[in-house]
Amino acid sequence: MNANKDERLKARSQDFHLFPALMMLSMTMLFLPVTGTLKQNIPRLKLTYKDLLLSNSCIPFLGSSEGLDFQTLLLDEERGRLLLGAKDHIFLLSLVDLNKNFKKIYWPAAKERVELCKLAGKDANTECANFIRVLQPYNKTHIYVCGTGAFHPICGYIDLGVYKEDIIFKLDTHNLESGRLKCPFDPQQPFASVMTDEYLYSGTASDFLGKDTAFTRSLGPTHDHHYIRTDISEHYWLNGAKFIGTFFIPDTYNPDDDKIYFFFRESSQEGSTSDKTILSRVGRVCKNDVGGQRSLINKWTTFLKARLICSIPGSDGADTYFDELQDIYLLPTRDERNPVVYGVFTTTSSIFKGSAVCVYSMADIRAVFNGPYAHKESADHRWVQYDGRIPYPRPGTCPSKTYDPLIKSTRDFPDDVISFIKRHSVMYKSVYPVAGGPTFKRINVDYRLTQIVVDHVIAEDGQYDVMFLGTDIGTVLKVVSISKEKWNMEEVVLEELQIFKHSSIILNMELSLKQQQLYIGSRDGLVQLSLHRCDTYGKACADCCLARDPYCAWDGNACSRYAPTSKRRARRQDVKYGDPITQCWDIEDSISHETADEKVIFGIEFNSTFLECIPKSQQATIKWYIQRSGDEHREELKPDERIIKTEYGLLIRSLQKKDSGMYYCKAQEHTFIHTIVKLTLNVIENEQMENTQRAEHEEGKVKDLLAESRLRYKDYIQILSSPNFSLDQYCEQMWHREKRRQRNKGGPKWKHMQEMKKKRNRRHHRDLDELPRAVAT
């Protein structure tokens, strides 16, 4: 395909006499609507930052001028509050309104540490400060907090108790402790932690350079302090790991079987080759692991890991892999042992850029951990399936009195179990997605997915999982997964939302089901975003059904939030098919009160004119029809050398008298067609225009009108000749041109008034006809 494109470019440079035709071809290819399945990958609704502010569905945190880099969030649904970790600051915010009565703690790094950090060559603004990376609930009244401390991690406790009906929000500066192996040194390093039973489980780097990575357990009740970490001497365990998520997931109803699962990516080297690849992994350890008795002392004795596969199967048998895990989200189910695992992955290739979402089941993950182990003779060998004897109890099994009364803790494990786990921590089989491949993917776009949260929504026609996907350019994609026949899935992109004023990578997202809000952090700000904006879809039943948004339904008067209820109500919604014809039985009334926009446009013969028509839905296919003057029949307009269809409307070059008439812009989604714009075009004959021009030449009105018309015609030619020049840029240019024109009008008038004040010093004054053209008009 690239070779063909190069040939076309070469031909265009050689055959310059074909330039106008090639311009027309490139314009047509650039702007013609995309049809078929590709349309479904286009967000149906695209809202800018300004649109979100106007709809009151986006609230930016305004107290952020004192601290940036908002990558740590702790959601407290029960008390309706949000803790925000930033640069040198910790904020306590309300889930209802981020800017209402918020509190803050200023916690900078020690001055001597900042100076040492600078001497080490680190950046004073982006590295040599105290970036808050750990916010974990320690108990009902305290939060455990850690910061990078200018590459010297430090931890402490925040008091969140109540005193005289007022919330205490205070850092205990008298009980600060080292944050090594609890918090990363580098504020940009991927990191994961979870607190359970007053134990902190962390995946991070243990040194200044970030080379030694470890998964650790620290803290705990004062009477039972067990510090455990991965074995640094065994490179099979972890190799440059980047930790993404850590979770407590019970395996059975027996609490002795409780495990901590952690997700990460790491480097891997196969055989004697020097090439290293990035692989995504899931690992697990037992909560009751206290290390070995004679070997692996204060090291995990139940550590296992397996590969996570997220790939697109190729027709030739070669898969396309998304190997770099970026984020993990666990969607709760009724069974706390079996949450649905959602993962965001990206490609490692600099040529083939893409992102994907893969979904896994805990049953499949457990099956891999209960399967065969991988074996490697030495660093120069490849991983193979281990076929030897497996010691008892099975390595990776949690000690339990019900399993074996003689093994009460990991210190009771036989030596052969400890020796086996040191060399065989990798499982031979990999974990594959439940769908066999990605549930959602984005390929060759100008952004990558970075974050994900998922909401399970009950709609009128079923239950749906709605994904909110953050990107590295500060946008959020709202995607619904729809089950089709034969176990096929359809992914519909409902919205693309620009939640930040300027492009900024999304670092963290938290979902509040009670508030129906998303809380999104980036390096430049924090935003509170509503899960739904039903009123933006339109004012008709058809618009609401076409949206296919599980959150929204037609209530008879408007598109509003759908709430499941036992009462019988006339709520119309069709998420599965998006067919308003079956849902909106009073469809004619629904469309009639919508009323398409009607405008009258005048064009000058032999000049060009543009008929604007921008559908609200980007998934709609536009067709143009004309009803010529004196004719009752409508005919569809086909593009040719004079008529060019663009994504913004219809460009008609060299207007003719026969072009006069009523133009209908119709949008089609699925089987539903409706008119969104009616335009009456009146073509003024060139001879008539010249007569008018001569009659009004003294005032110069028509002259300016023609100049503006010719200028715009030249601009359209510029759009045709430059594929990189969009209509958005044209409109921006026209806006600035109008501003300059108004300033030019106002400036000379003011200057003229000043001259009138000084008329006693002048003998003659200019007449209006002698003034510059900008004033005369």
From Swiss-Prot:
Ig-like C2-type domain ranges (all copies): 592-680
Compositionally biased region (Basic residues): 738-765
Glycosylation sites: N139, N607, N724
UniProt xrefs under SUPFAM superfamilies: Immunoglobulin, Plexin repeat, Sema domain
Region: Disordered, residue numbers: 738-777
PROSITE patterns in UniProt: IG_LIKE, SEMA
Keywords, alphabetical: Developmental protein, Differentiation, Disulfide bond, Glycoprotein, Immunoglobulin domain, Neurogenesis, Secreted, Signal
Any single Gene Ontology cellular-component annotation: extracellular space
Domain Sema intervals: 44-531
Pfam families: Ig_6, Sema
CDD domains: Ig_Sema3, Sema_3D
Subcellular location: Secreted
GO terms assigned for molecular function: chemorepellent activity; neuropilin binding; semaphorin receptor binding
GO annotation terms (biological process): axon guidance; negative chemotaxis; neural crest cell migration; positive regulation of cell migration; semaphorin-plexin signaling pathway
Residues covered by the PSI domain: 533-585
Extent of Basic and acidic residues compositional bias: 766-777
Disulphides: C117-C128, C146-C155, C286-C398, C310-C358, C534-C552, C665-C731
Signal peptide, first to last residue: 1-36
InterPro entries noted in UniProt: Ig-like_dom (IPR007110), Ig-like_dom_sf (IPR036179), Ig-like_fold (IPR013783), Ig_sub (IPR003599), IL-1RAcP-like_ig (IPR041416), PSI (IPR016201), Sema3D_Sema (IPR042582), Semap_dom (IPR001627)
Entry function: Induces the collapse and paralysis of neuronal growth cones. Could potentially act as repulsive cues toward specific neuronal populations. Binds to neuropilin.
Family per similarity comment: Belongs to the semaphorin family.
Domains (record comment): Strong binding to neuropilin is mediated by the carboxy third of the protein.
Name of the featured protein: Semaphorin-3D
Organism: Homo sapiens
Underlying gene: SEMA3D
